[in-house]
C-alpha cells in the first residue's frame, strides 16, 4: 500500500504517502474491530445460552464469557500508533522531515505487520 501511495504522491510528497499508509492501516484495523463487535454479540448469545443450560443442570462449572483476544490486540496496536503520531508530525516539521518520517513509518508498519 505504501508503494501505491508513493506512486500517487510522487517523491516530493513522500511523508504524505507515509502518513496515508498509516492512516489506511488504522482504518483497516477499525474495520476489523467493527466486524469483531458483530461477532462478539453472536458469541455472547451462544455462551449465554450455554450458561443457562449449565444452570438448569446445576453443574458447578459455568462457562464464563471472556473478551476475545483479537479485540485486546487491536486496542494495543491502536494505542501504540496514536503514541507515535505526535513524534511523526514533529519529525515532519523539522528540516530533514522526509528521512525521519520514512524511518518512523517503517517502525510503525513493522509493528502492525
Swiss-Prot record:
Keywords: Membrane, Transmembrane, Transmembrane helix. The chain crosses the membrane at residues 13-35, 70-92. It comes from the Eukaryota. One of its GO terms (cellular component) is membrane. The keyword Membrane applies. It is found in: Membrane. It is a multi-pass membrane protein. Identified in a screen for mutants with decreased levels of rDNA transcription. This is Regulator of rDNA transcription protein 7. It comes from Saccharomyces cerevisiae (strain ATCC 204508 / S288c) (Baker's yeast). The lineage of its organism: Eukaryota, Fungi, Dikarya, Ascomycota, Saccharomycotina.
Amino acid at each position: 500500500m505504501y508503494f501505491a501511495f508513493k506512486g500517487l504522491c510522487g517523491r516530493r510528497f513522500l511523508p504524505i504517502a507515509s502518513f496515508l499508509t498509516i492512516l489506511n492501516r488504522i482504518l483497516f484495523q477499525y474495520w476489523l474491530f467493527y466486524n469483531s463487535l458483530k461477532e462478539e454479540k453472536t458469541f455472547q448469545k451462544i455462551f449465554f445460552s450455554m450458561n443457562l443450560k449449565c444452570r438448569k443442570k446445576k453443574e458447578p462449572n459455568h462457562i464464563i464469557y471472556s473478551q476475545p483476544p483479537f479485540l485486546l490486540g487491536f486496542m494495543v496496536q491502536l494505542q501504540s500508533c496514536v503514541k507515535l503520531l505526535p513524534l511523526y508530525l514533529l519529525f515532519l516539521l523539522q528540516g530533514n522531515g522526509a528521512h525521519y518520517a520514512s524511518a518512523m513509518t517503517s517502525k510503525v508498519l513493522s509493528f502492525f505487520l
